[in-house]
């Protein structure tokens, strides 16, 4: 989705992407 939680998970999975 596009929720804040999703963004948080992405950052945790790949900090480089953050």
Curated annotation (Swiss-Prot):
What is one Gene Ontology biological process annotated in the Swiss-Prot or TrEMBL record? defense response to fungus
> Which tissue types show expression of this protein?
Leaves.
UniProtKB keywords? Antimicrobial, Fungicide
> Which superkingdom heads the taxonomic lineage of this protein's source?
Eukaryota
Regarding temperature, what does the record state about activity? Thermostable.
Q: What else is known?
A: Resistant to heat and proteolysis.
Q: What is the purpose of this protein?
A: Has antifungal activity against the plant fungal pathogens G.graminis, P.infestans, P.megasperma and S.sclerotiorum. Does not have antifungal activity against the human pathogen C.albicans. Does not have ribonuclease activity.
Q: What is this protein called?
A: 30 kDa antifungal protein
Q: Which organism is it from?
A: Engelmannia peristenia
The uppermost taxa in this organism's lineage are: Eukaryota, Viridiplantae, Streptophyta, Embryophyta, Tracheophyta
């Amino acid at each position: 989705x596009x929720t804040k939680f999703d963004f948080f998970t992405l950052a945790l999975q790949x900090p480089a992407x953050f």
